[in-house]
């Protein structure tokens, strides 16, 4: 689960006549990725497969469009009986053509309407800046005393216009879009400005005769609305027709996917006069299974690829439980893991929801996010989307952790429903919220962790400092583990240069923050005080104060200096070896990349995790501010009175929608940033290729 599966390169040699049963066996196994043979027994390919695979893929795309427009879940169903895969591909392709023919008119109508709509929308976009002009442009351009020109230009043309027009004439412009301007030019008739501007490449707006921009804009808008109505009616007609043969369409779709994969094997195979050669990758632990399946049909052999130095890197297969496999979609944003890399998914399954929950600690907001995620998951499934359900499950995991942190923080759509005006005004004479005594987490728990609560009724004068240290401690731990994984990856790669000149210097650097912020373990009862003392010792060591009183501080400074010098030297050697630089420039570049940049990254990456505290604070105080505004507009001095006031309710709803929508999105993005930039960059390159086996999408009879 943590490491990619060991792969072998499988070679199958058989009589040409055995091709169909061999392909059937490989499809049923669903664990074989075909490749072009390394040492082909001949140059001859199976031409029928090469010719058919393009047509089959085209049918797959068309059926997906039909299913999507018809509102069907895009999934394969049914079975297929095969004696010859070439014959099966021809038959299924013909069947798909007949199916598509039944929807041809509706699809063409939808396509025509979409094209027409796109054309009108482009015209609207061009008219948008001048849509408020109610005068015909032809009348504007034919004044007796002045030349009037209205044009759309870029920044370079705008400067050119100012040079041509000079100071004696009038130029007015306003910006719209990126580096685009609408320009109104009024000039005297005798200077022939229109001709000069045409020569400079400036073209004035020309519209249909007899209509102002205002009239034309509204006519086009009305036409688009009419097209939308017709388009919706046509889609409904298509959806109704598709529903009547849903299972048949899904069966044809499944058969197309299956013959496509069969043709993919055949397309990469090589044949001679008598023999067939098939090669590809297969998980090593399942080799015996494939041997048992095709032992009586063909001769099979395999080799184990080296992890480093091969011309072709094997595909990567990381077998994960279904419950966490969805996180693969997040990792793939960064890139697929290489064959020798530790998968970051297992790392991500814990850290991503935890960091999200710490930055979004509100039970009510998290509950809304959970319900939205469940709806979004069902919506994605209905649309047949691959990414929406995966993203939804990630949000579900994250919102569950946010519910837990919200319970501990005693926040439910802000501080008002639980802490009440007592918390908002920090005054014990006011009432608590209606949920105060009903809260599932007793107040004693919040009292016990008050040293880590940076806000709310139970926070203390030092809790902000403690939470800051705790946030950086999380970062130090994450960076240490990330750099350690980088060393392990380098060892697995069996590349000494990669290990000793890239990953080991990085690991030695990121030992420093974990040592500093974990030093408090030496005295757990005074953990945060000890950490603050160590930070003080480091400052004293930098300022060259007494050695005997700051031994640990001096040790940390010396270790950091050694690690930075090592990183400097390592980068200098890499620049010298790979960029053919002189020693002088190599040392200079090594200092910039390894010494100076290394020190900056050590500091910035570690401190970057303070954003965990910052976003938790911002979430709380956004809702605190709206709760206070609700208190100000309500005439009541009791919490219940505020919560039932209509204007106060509207203010609280607006504040919570802002927190859920904007803050939730920002926290999700920042969580991704902490993983991709601060953590993954220490050990994960993501330059591999994903294992994509061929398989049977329907039952093979």
UniProtKB/Swiss-Prot annotation:
Keywords: Cell membrane, Hydrogen ion transport, Ion transport, Membrane, Transmembrane, Transmembrane helix, Transport. One of its GO terms (biological process) is vacuolar acidification. It is found in: Cell membrane. One of its GO terms (cellular component) is vacuolar proton-transporting V-type ATPase complex. Component of the A-type ATP synthase that produces ATP from ADP in the presence of a proton gradient across the membrane. This is A-type ATP synthase subunit I. It comes from Saccharolobus solfataricus (strain ATCC 35092 / DSM 1617 / JCM 11322 / P2) (Sulfolobus solfataricus). GO terms for molecular function: ATPase binding; proton-transporting ATPase activity, rotational mechanism. The chain crosses the membrane at residues 340-360, 363-379, 388-408, 435-455, 468-488, 498-518, 555-575, 583-603, 612-632, 649-669. Gene3D superfamilies: 1.20.1460.20, 3.30.70.2170, 3.30.70.2750. The lineage of its organism: Archaea, Thermoproteota, Thermoprotei, Sulfolobales, Sulfolobaceae.
């Amino acid at each position: 689960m943590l490491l990619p599966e060991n792969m072998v390169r499988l070679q199958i040699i058989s009589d040409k006549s055995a091709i169909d049963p061999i392909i059937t066996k490989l499809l049923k196994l669903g664990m074989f990725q075909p490749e072009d043979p390394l040492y082909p027994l001949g140059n001859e390919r199976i031409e029928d497969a090469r010719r058919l695979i393009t047509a089959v893929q085209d049918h797959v795309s068309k059926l997906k469009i039909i299913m999507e427009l018809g509102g069907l879940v895009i999934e394969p169903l049914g079975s297929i009986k095969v004696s010859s895969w070439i014959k099966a591909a021809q038959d299924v392709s013909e069947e798909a053509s007949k199916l598509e023919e039944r929807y041809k008119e509706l699809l063409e109508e939808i396509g025509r309407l979409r094209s027409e709509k796109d054309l009108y929308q482009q015209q609207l976009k061009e008219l948008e800046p001048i849509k408020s002009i109610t005068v015909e442009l032809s009348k504007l351009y034919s004044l007796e005393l002045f030349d009037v020109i209205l044009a759309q230009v870029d920044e370079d043309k705008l400067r050119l216009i100012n040079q041509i027009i000079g100071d004696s004439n009038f130029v007015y412009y306003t910006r719209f879009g990126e580096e685009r301007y609408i320009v109104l030019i009024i000039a005297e008739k005798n200077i022939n400005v229109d001709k000069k501007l045409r020569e400079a490449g400036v073209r004035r707006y020309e519209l249909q005769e007899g209509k102002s921009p205002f009239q034309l804009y509204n006519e086009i808008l009305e036409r688009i609305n009419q097209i939308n109505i017709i388009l919706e009616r046509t889609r409904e007609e298509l959806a109704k027709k598709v529903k009547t043969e849903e299972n048949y369409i899904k069966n044809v779709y499944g058969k197309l996917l299956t013959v496509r994969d069969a043709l993919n094997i055949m397309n990469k195979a090589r044949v001679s006069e008598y023999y067939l050669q098939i090669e590809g990758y297969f998980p090593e632990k399942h080799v015996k299974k494939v041997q048992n399946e095709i032992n009586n049909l063909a001769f099979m052999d395999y080799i184990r690829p080296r992890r480093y130095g091969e011309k072709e890197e094997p595909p990567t297969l990381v077998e994960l439980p279904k419950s966490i496999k969805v996180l693969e979609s997040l990792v793939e944003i960064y890139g697929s893991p290489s064959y020798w890399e530790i998968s970051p998914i297992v790392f991500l399954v814990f850290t991503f929801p935890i960091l999200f929950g710490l930055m979004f600690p509100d039970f009510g907001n998290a509950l809304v996010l959970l319900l939205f995620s469940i709806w979004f998951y069902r919506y994605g499934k209905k649309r047949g989307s691959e990414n929406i359900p995966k993203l939804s499950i990630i949000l579900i995991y994250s919102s569950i952790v946010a519910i837990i942190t919200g319970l501990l923080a005693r926040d439910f759509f802000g501080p008002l429903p639980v802490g009440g005006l007592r918390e908002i005004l920090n005054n014990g004479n006011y009432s608590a919220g209606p949920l105060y005594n009903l809260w599932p987490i007793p107040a004693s728990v919040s009292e016990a962790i008050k040293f880590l609560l940076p806000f709310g009724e139970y926070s203390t004068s030092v809790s902000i400092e403690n939470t800051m240290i705790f946030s950086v401690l999380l970062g130090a731990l994450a960076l240490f583990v990330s750099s350690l994984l980088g060393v392990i990856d380098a060892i697995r790669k069996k590349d000494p240069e990669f290990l000793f000149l890239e990953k080991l210097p990085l690991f030695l650097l990121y030992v420093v923050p974990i040592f500093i912020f974990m030093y408090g373990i030496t005295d757990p009862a005074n953990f945060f005080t000890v950490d603050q003392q160590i930070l003080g010792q480091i400052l004293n060591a930098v300022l060259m104060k007494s050695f005997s009183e700051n031994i640990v501080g001096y040790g940390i400074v010396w270790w950091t200096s050694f690690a930075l010098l090592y990183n400097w030297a390592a980068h200098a050697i890499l620049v010298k070896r790979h960029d053919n630089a002189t020693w002088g420039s190599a040392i200079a570049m090594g200092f910039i990349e390894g010494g100076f940049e290394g020190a900056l990254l050590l500091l910035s990456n570690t401190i970057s995790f303070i954003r965990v505290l910052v976003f938790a604070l911002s979430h709380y105080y956004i809702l605190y501010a709206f709760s206070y505004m609700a208190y100000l507009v309500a005439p009541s001095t009791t919490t219940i009175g505020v919560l039932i006031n209509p204007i106060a309710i509207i203010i609280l709803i607006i504040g919570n929608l802002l927190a859920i929508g904007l803050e939730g999105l920002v926290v999700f993005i920042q969580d991704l940033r902490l993983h991709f930039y601060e953590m993954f960059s220490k050990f994960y390159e993501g330059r591999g290729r994903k294992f994509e086996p061929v398989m049977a999408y329907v039952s093979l009879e």
